[in-house]
A protein has these predicted regions:
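Non-catalytic, surface-exposed connector residues within folded enzymatic/regulatory domains
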Residues: 103, 146-149, 165-168, 188, ...
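Acidic, Mg2+-coordinating catalytic module of metal-dependent nucleases/exonucleases
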Residues: 121-128, 132-133, 137-138, 170-232
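Short alpha-helix plus adjacent loop in nuclease-associated cores
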Residues: 152-168
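A broadly conserved amphipathic alpha-helix scaffold signal in soluble, globular proteins
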Residues: 114, 160, 199-202
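Acidic two-metal-ion nuclease catalytic site recognized across multiple nuclease folds
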Residues: 1-30, 199-240
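Conserved non-catalytic scaffold segment of RNase H-like nuclease domains
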Residues: 13-150, 173-184, 232-238
Length: 240
């Protein structure tokens, strides 16, 4: 067997093992109640909005939820993006080049972030944005592998599944309409938005429980319904 064939077989095997591990992880969590689950609500700030244009993470934060309560366990790190921060992004999150130039790159925080995420369900608002940036900012690391295989809940989809009639699922709109406290947090900071999203998430879990949805599997089903609503809303906006 030549080396190219061996590499291809190893690649296929690794892909298969990753897919298998993902579904084993999903199935393991499906029957677990939200009460017994540990959640990490994640948020990032970046140098720009397009990961494919070379934009990277400048700040990452996580808020841990246990027993359906926000804990004091937090992750809050400035990150050296190893590239320039756009002026537009600085206007939004107020993180300057000077603040991050001596901070660790995301890959250097690999163990710290991985340990924080271990045995948790990952939550975020437009979470796929954060996941893509983590994978691009720290490729071939344990955290990149972790976020590819972890159970995830996007509060956009969960909110759409519970409140299908809302005209928007933007974080500020949801917090205003659902009376989620935000005044004590700094918006567009990774930690501030993480805490606010955690509060929103707990509200959504409470509303889900009123529909007798109390397992991770049930929450994922609501998210899937919400995702379909999001797709329909986008299609409707394209038509009109």
């Amino acid at each position: 067997m030549n080396s190219r064939q061996e590499r291809e077989e190893i690649l296929v095997k690794n892909i298969f093992n990753n897919i298998k591990a993902y579904f084993v992880n999903i199935n393991r969590h499906k029957k677990i109640t939200t009460q017994k689950s540990i959640f990490v609500v994640l948020d990032t700030e970046t140098t720009g909005l397009d990961v494919n244009e070379g934009h990277r993470i400048v700040s990452i934060a996580g808020t841990k939820i246990k027993n359906l309560k926000i804990t004091n366990e937090i992750l809050d790190e400035l990150v050296n993006p190893e590239c320039q921060i756009s002026e537009r992004s600085i206007e939004i999150h107020h993180i300057t080049q000077e603040q991050v130039e001596n901070k660790p790159a995301l890959k250097e925080l690999d163990n710290k972030i991985y340990n924080f995420l271990e045995d948790t369900v990952l939550v975020g608002h437009n979470l796929n944005f954060d996941i893509k940036f983590i994978i691009k900012s720290a490729p071939y690391t344990t955290i990149a592998h972790r976020v590819k295989n972890i159970v995830t809940i996007d509060t956009i989809y969960l909110a759409a599944g519970i409140y299908p009639h809302f005209k928007s699922y933007e974080l500020s709109f949801l917090c205003e309409n659902l009376k989620i406290q935000t005044e004590d947090q700094t918006r567009h900071s990774a930690l501030g938005d993480s805490v606010i999203t955690a509060r929103l998430f707990l509200h959504l879990l409470e509303e889900a429980s009123k529909k007798n949805v109390t397992t991770i599997g049930g929450i994922l089903h609501l998210c899937q319904q919400g995702k379909q609503i999001q797709i329909l809303m986008k299609d409707f906006n394209k038509i009109h």
